Amino acid sequence: MASILQYMRTDSPATVPPADTNDAHALVFRCHDPTPAALQRIGEAADQLQACRVAVWVSLDTTHIPEEPPSLLPILQHSPPRKKRRSEHRTPSQKVRRALATHIARGAVQIHEYDENDMIRTYPVLRDLKRNARLQESVEFSRGTHSLAWGLHAEALNVWYQHLERKPSFVWCFEDDVGFSGSLETLLDIVRRDCGDADLITADVKLRPSEAWWWLEVHSTAFAERYGNDVHNIYVSREHVQRFSMRFLDRLHVLSLQRVTCWSEALVPTIAHAENFGVAELPRLGTPFAHDGRVTAQEWEHITASRAGRRADRLYHALKF
């Protein structure tokens, strides 16, 4: 077995490396308010992966879920309030648990709920980052419709991962609007064969993002001091689907505690390259697989009907239905 010294750094905790026999994987779907179709895909993923003992989780960001204001109409009418029908005003948590009830009951899917405050309590640097001028100028944050979890995936993921009693050796992270035109067991087998035990598997890693990239200045002071804050030192990648090793997630956790963070599209690949973690390109990408990609329900039905050829066993983003 590899020496534990290979898994430690001078300012990181003594994390025990995964045992040679521990090849446990988990797949986490990042959600905020998933559609019925997205929940159906999550259930199908759990069915596909149950035989190979991959733990499937839903990581649900519950920030900015509006509470229903009390109705004044019954008071004005001097009448008792009507009982609400059960189908009315379900929260995302209720919708997730209802749609996946049978999977949850048999342990095929587990749910982790958190919000922005949980992230800030775990990583106090995020309180300062939320006041970043560039972040506050963005449409998403100026309207107050998005939480930090939308752009700081590493901390959102580690809020879940660092509290597990038994950590899996590798964690897949899927956005809930990703589709795979085949069995996810096939994807995991392809990655094991082609990428081995890489610490980070991600798509389209690039050095030097455009200076016009909106999120370039969204970083902590400690990040700039350690890695630089200009485009010549920064890597970016698409994060719709990624796989992390235990030791890489633990390292990201330590750095966040040390106030080293930035927008996660840049944070994850920049640290991986700067600190010599193993990085591999995510295979089996379909078209589209991009932040502005769109796949309709009709198109997805056609893609998944193609059981052979160039559309089979590929990842697509984004399934906006």
Feature-to-residue mapping (PLM):
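Structural motif
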Residues: 29-34, 58-62, 176
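Conserved catalytic core of nucleotide-sugar-dependent glycosyltransferases
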Residues: 179-269
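Juxtamembrane luminal stem/stalk of type II transmembrane Golgi/ER carbohydrate-processing enzymes
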Residues: 1-26, 80-86
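Short beta-strand-to-loop acidic/aromatic patch adjacent to the donor-nucleotide binding site
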Residues: 168-177
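Active-site-proximal specificity loops/subdomain of glycosyltransferases
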Residues: 65-82, 89-167
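C-terminal catalytic/acceptor-binding lobe
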Residues: 253-321
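Short, well-formed alpha-helical segments that are part of the catalytic scaffolds
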Residues: 4, 35-48, 94
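Hydrophobic targeting segments
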Residues: 23-29, 53-56
